[in-house]
Design a protein with these regions (language model features):
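Short secondary-structure boundary segments
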Residues: 1-4, 29, 95-98, 114
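A late-sequence structural motif
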Residues: 109-152
Length: 152
């Protein structure tokens, strides 16, 4: 999940934060002319849905930066957002850890990173599963290498 479970509200459910990473903005070549983040006003944007924590964080970030962006669409799937972005010459957002996959596609370029807007990852499990070996392994694994910044 992209947010923790409040166990006082969701009885019997628990969550453990397993990592977080910043987000990057991507587009197909050629990149916008203005520097980041002003370039976000040059093309329409594809963002995570407002129901997601990341979608809400991004809307707040746009506002705090004084950016007047045009949102073309909201998506719950990063791969679909990337495909739609390529088809409509739009800028799209994805967690920076996706960079390894996106760099393989030479038609897609990273135009900027925001390290103070974080995508969070939480493992959610039922109380009855807390002693299950798989849940224990997920909760006790060090994921820091997975969430380290991608090299540009």
């Amino acid at each position: 999940s992209d947010c923790p479970i409040d166990s006082t509200q969701q009885e019997g459910l628990f969550s453990v934060r397993i990592g977080e990473c910043g987000v990057s903005f991507w587009c197909t070549n050629p990149p916008p002319e203005k520097p980041f983040p002003a370039c976000l006003e040059e093309r329409r944007l594809l963002i995570p849905g407002r129901r997601s924590m990341l979608g809400r964080k991004l809307l707040n970030w746009f506002n705090s930066q004084g950016l007047n962006v045009e949102i073309l669409g909201e998506f719950d799937d990063a791969a679909l957002m990337k495909a739609f972005g390529a088809m409509h010459n739009a800028i799209f957002v994805a967690p920076t850890l996706y960079a390894y996959d996106f760099y393989a596609d030479k038609t897609v370029v990273e135009i900027g990173r925001v390290e103070n807007v974080m995508e969070e990852y939480h493992a959610i499990f039922a109380e009855r599963m807390i002693q299950h070996p798989a849940v224990q392994r997920i909760c006790n694994t060090d994921y820091s290498a997975l969430f380290s910044p991608a090299v540009r």
